[in-house]
Amino acid sequence: MKKIVLLTLLASVLFFSFERLSKTQTKPENTEQDKGRPKLIALKFGEPDELTYDAGTVRFLATSVDTNGAWSLVELKEMPGYHTNLHRHNHTDEAFYVMEGVLTVKINDKFSDYPAGSYVLIPRGTPHAQGNRGKVPARILLTMTPGGFERSFKDRVDLFKTAKPSDPDFRQKRKENAAKGNYDVEFLADWDLPT
């Protein structure tokens, strides 16, 4: 008899504990606790659309708006012959994962080639430049921490609609856009890709 009473008591305690626990763990969506959390992002192959800019194409996979400024992720397809100016980001780390082709990176006056499967992390404040000296497009995943610098690619997409890299003042317009947009980029020098 004692066992039956004890088991009944234990079952009642467990039942009411689980019921109370489930009520406390259920909360309405978009509460104060949700502020500062990244949005859910679920993209299928080919989403979102590729946008054309002066280096090739860009796809915005996760923007700083999606991650509350924590980071951003873009997929770049850089065409052969494209290269950046020597520059640095004083507040942004950049991480490159090469998916196709070869990415050439200049750090501390040293050029290195990174084929598909390579990963390069450039800490904030490091002068660097990158480009594609190969014969095929280089497809790259670029993560920026914190987010925000991806907005510069949006401006470059918009600039490409009205101006082309062959225009004599194209690079100057790009620098001016970067300065206006406050993208944490400091241009240091022009350079040419080694052949």
Specify the residue positions occupied by each region the protein language model found.
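A generic "binding-loop/recognition-motif" signal
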Residues: 57, 80, 91, 110, ...
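Ligand-binding loop in jelly-roll beta-barrel domains
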Residues: 69, 104, 124-150
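Short acidic-glycine-tyrosine-enriched beta hairpin
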Residues: 109-127
